[in-house]
Amino acid sequence: MIGEHKALVQRITNETKIQIAISLNGGHIELPESILDKNPTQENNIATQATTSQVIDIHTGVGFLDHMIHALAKHSGWSLIVECIGDLHIDDHHTTEDCGIALGEAFKQALGQVRGVKRFGCGFAPLDEALSRAVVDLSNRPYAVIDLGLKREKIGDLSCEMIPHFLESFIEAARLTVHIDCLRGFNDHHRSESAFKALAVAIREATAPNGTNDVPSTKGVLM
């Protein structure tokens, strides 16, 4: 995409406190002030990466969720900072759902008007034996169809039922139409990660410039 596509989002409820900085074109981003009491240990910096083209720093309090959001940001080409303080003493539901909602809102704000981009994107991503496909439409018509075929109860400290729910929450808040299918694979970690990477590839294609300044719709608007 051409131009600056950045957003800062805060979402505060009785269940979670979240803040997000995003740049869809990568590059430098920062939060005005961290809400976390972070100690620079290897464990809590597992989803942190900084290069000349991207800054990624994910801290949701749920390790496998951090890992998935990191993969999504990396392969979408985003710079992304996510901080969340959630009621994990209850379970992982509110944190996972609210992070998906907040990330979707941040993406929508950063994207702005759907103009001069391809609009549609398709991505395939393998991870060893697992293969996933994602198809994206920047339609402003939220609809999610997700089939990951997960078998385990949990991966790390994230309930497997919350993995598609995070994706649904993100997709609805971002106002996208997305179909994600894990086509094969027997390891649920691999199935999940390949799905997030496929989504990233599809988003990157959908948001790529199409060589015009037109709205890619016969309606003339996407709203």
Swiss-Prot record:
Q: In which pathway does it act?
A: Amino-acid biosynthesis; L-histidine biosynthesis; L-histidine from 5-phospho-alpha-D-ribose 1-diphosphate: step 6/9
Q: What is its EC number?
A: 4.2.1.19
Q: Does the keyword ATP-binding apply?
A: no
The answer on whether this UniProt entry bears the keyword Cell membrane reads no
Q: Provide the alphabetized UniProt keywords.
A: Amino-acid biosynthesis, Histidine biosynthesis, Lyase
PANTHER family to which the protein is assigned, alphabetical: IMIDAZOLEGLYCEROL-PHOSPHATE DEHYDRATASE (PTHR23133:SF2), IMIDAZOLEGLYCEROL-PHOSPHATE DEHYDRATASE HIS7 (PTHR23133)
Name of the molecule in the record: Imidazoleglycerol-phosphate dehydratase
